[in-house]
Each structure stands twice: as structure tokens, then as C-alpha cells.
Amino acid sequence: MPPYISAFQAAYIGIEVLIALVSVPGNVLVIWAVKVNQALRDATFCFIVSLAVADVAVGALVIPLAILINIGPQTYFHTCLMVACPVLILTQSSILALLAIAVDRYLRVKIPLRYKTVVTQRRAAVAIAGCWILSLVVGLTPMFGWNNLSEVEQAWIANGSVGEPVIKCEFEKVISMEYMVYFNFFVWVLPPLLLMVLIYLEVFYLIRKQLNKKVSASSGDPQKYYGKELKIAKSLALILFLFALSWLPLHILNCITLFCPTCQKPSILIYIAIFLTHGNSAMNPIVYAFRIHKFRVTFLKIWNDHFRCQPKPPIEEDIPEEKADD
């Protein structure tokens, strides 16, 4: 017999489905844009594709699993654990992709003349692969023992049951809060976020320093270059800000759960925090469309060619510098 779904759960499911319906097509469009436009093939956009892949997976995999967990089916402990781990993997992948983007932008303004020889497509691919491998290690750590199995087994045996525990599948029931706070948040979320803030502050400082230099007749190109870098850096810093704004509330709630077990957390706050984390996967394509000219032009080209059946001339691969990003 299927589980009873309350009106509140139905509303929750409806919002989650809406987020998924925005996230998946939006991020597929980002990947599509990079594929069809040669001007979007540098290292930064490769890292953006990695971020978009993680966001597609959030909409196509994590949100359906979150809905399943919310309904609360009875499952074996390790089955529930496998359902809970993908969100950890994808979150870590997003963080590392954002860090790679920040480092890439720093190198573009710190060593502009040597950038293309230092940051090659091959090295970018290796960095992306490394990010995903590390994300798998961090996200799958609960599968290798850092979980709540011992506590669940004690309660299972105390009730006179045998075999692997069967539980109502809930995230906090299988994932250890010590893992979430001490390992996930304090090691793999908070330090990278703080490092990215420092990197972007340095990027803005270096760009402002260059832009404040006296402009001579021969310095037009550097001024244009750093002006473009400033616009892109602002857009990518906005992506970082939205990510932090979306994920920090849930991690703060996890800290409250660990350090103040008797403290009551209103359900509405928990749901808002969950919506923010999932909704973040739908935000990035919107930011790209409104803030990065190359993406906006390519999105419109794809829309006109494939959905309105009104082909336009091929995308210009070398967009003029003054219009590259507005």
C-alpha cells in the first residue's frame, strides 16, 4: 500500500518538481552552449560545464531521491545510505568546481601573458577529473563506516529484531552529524568558501590596480582586457555568493543539531534550507544569461535555431572585446 502523503508533503513535492524542471533544462542549455560556441571553450567555461553537470544531477537525481526520503519509505539501512550519499558527492563537486573557477580567474589577472601556456585544456581536464574523484571520496565516506549504523543496530537488536536494520529512510537517521559538521562542513565546505572569498578579493584588487593606472595611447588593450575580466569576475563572484547563501543555512542547522541536541528546529526552517540548496542548482543558468554576454548570445541562438525554427547566422566565435561580457 503506498504511503499516505499529506497536503504539506504534496506542496513540498510540488516545489521540488518545479525546481527540477528549471534546473535540468537550464543547465543542459549551459552545457549545450559551451558545445556549440567555440568562444566558450577556455578553462573557465570547462569548469562551468563541470558545475552544470553537477546541477543537472541535482535536478535529475537528488531531487527525486529527496522526494522519496520525504515520503519516508521503509528500507534497509545501507539502501537508505546509498540514497543519501549522492547529494554529498554533488555538493562537493560544485564547491571544487567553484574553487577551480576562482583559481582560474586569479591566474588570468596575475599572469595574463603566460596564462594560456599555464592553463591548458589538458590541465583543465585533469583538474576537473581530480575534483570529481575527490568529491566521490568525500561523498562516499559514510558508505565506508562513518555513519549511524551502530546506533541504529543497537535499537534494532533491543527490539528483538535480527538481520540488517530496516528503517524509515531519513537523511539524519543514516548520516552522522559528526561527519556532516566536523568533516564535511569544517574541512570540505567552509575552508574552500573562505579561500574563494580571499581569491576573489585579490582578483578585484589586481584588476582595480591595473585599471587605475594612467591610460596612455598604447594601453587601450590592457584596459579593455582588465575591464572584461572585472565584469566576468563580478558574475562568477555572484555565483559563489549565491552558493554560500544557499548552502550555509543547512550547514548551520546541522551544527545546531550536533552541538545542541535539545534545541528545537522549526520544520519550516529545515524545509526552507532544503529548498535553498536544491534551488541553487537552478540559479546559475539565470545568472549566466543575464550577466555573461557570450552565454546570452548562445542561448538565444539555440532557442531560435531549435525551438523557434528561425535559424540565424552562425555564432561569432570571436566576440569583440568591448562586448564580450556586459
Swiss-Prot record:
Keywords: Cell membrane, Disulfide bond, G-protein coupled receptor, Glycoprotein, Lipoprotein, Membrane, Palmitate, Receptor, Transducer, Transmembrane, Transmembrane helix. One of its GO terms (molecular function) is G protein-coupled receptor binding. CDD domains: 7tmA_Adenosine_R_A1. Disulfide bonds join C80-C169. Coiled coil: none annotated. It is found in: Cell membrane. Residues 1-10, 70-80, 147-176, 260-267 are extracellular. One of its GO terms (cellular component) is basolateral plasma membrane. It comes from the Eukaryota. The keyword Transmembrane helix applies. Receptor for adenosine. The activity of this receptor is mediated by G proteins which inhibit adenylyl cyclase. This is Adenosine receptor A1. It comes from Mus musculus. The gene is Adora1.
